[in-house]
Amino acid sequence: MRQQSSVARLLASAAVTAILAAGLGGCQTVSDITGSLTSKPDTSPDAGLRHSVEVAGESYRANPKDADAALAYGQALRATGQRAQAAAVLEQATIAHPGNKDLLAAYGRALADNGNFQQALDTLTRAHSPDNPDWRILSVQGTVLDQLGRHDEARRYYASALNIVPGEPSVLSNLGLSYVLSRDLPKAEEVLRQAYSSGKADARVRQNLGLVVGLQGRFAEAESIVRADLPAAEAAANVAYLKQMLSRKDNPRGGPGTVPMASLSGPG
């Protein structure tokens, strides 16, 4: 299957369009840019994902009170973009197992997928405890706070996560995108370069850095960054598309044109 987090999706995203059109306005949300928390539905999930949903669904229907079965089914539904159903399954599971932190964490993510950010934050708070924090949940809480426009508070959560896993590129990537949302592109680039320099940095980190570099008008450099994950021709085409959108922002008389609606996605 083609990698879902391709830079083509990133550079053609509604998020980038909104950033360019609104100057990173307050209505923009981190879920539109990063897949660390919420991923948009894939219109054509591959056969492996569909099979996983079928298998998990059969197990769940055979024993809907089983926490592990509900968790697996909810995660499979999320992976194929079936957000509302995932939230419904996980909600029932958390009612049956109110103290199950894995279920609470998954339900919190599913709530965020559906745009219920405050409820997601409340649920995620119950998914771990101050004396035993989970850095992954801290990072997700940060992205939810960014969705709510509470960027300073979000960064405190990222800092707490980084205290547990110093230099973790996925957390640094979320932190960098938080700075994108507050219009501080140089700081965003600084943080994303920290993530980029990690031996554990994945394609999402490189694509996010390429986006931020491109948003600052350094297109050749952006192309060299994203080329690591794409054929040269595709990388060039995507950076050219970003350049076109930037030109469109600077010349509004050119009209908005037609922009494909897609976004970066990744593990939740």
Where are these regions (language model features)?
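Helix-start (N-cap) detector for alpha-helical repeat units in TPR-like alpha-solenoids
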Residues: 67-68, 101-102, 134-136, 151, ...
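Canonical tetratricopeptide repeat
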Residues: 72, 106, 139-140, 174, ...
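N-terminal leader/linker segments that initiate helical-solenoid repeat arrays
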Residues: 2, 6-10, 16, 20-72, ...
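Structural marker of alpha-solenoid helical repeat scaffolds
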Residues: 62, 96-97, 127-131, 164-165, ...
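Terminal, low-structured helical/coil segments at or just beyond the last alpha-helical repeat
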Residues: 31-36, 199, 203-205, 212-268
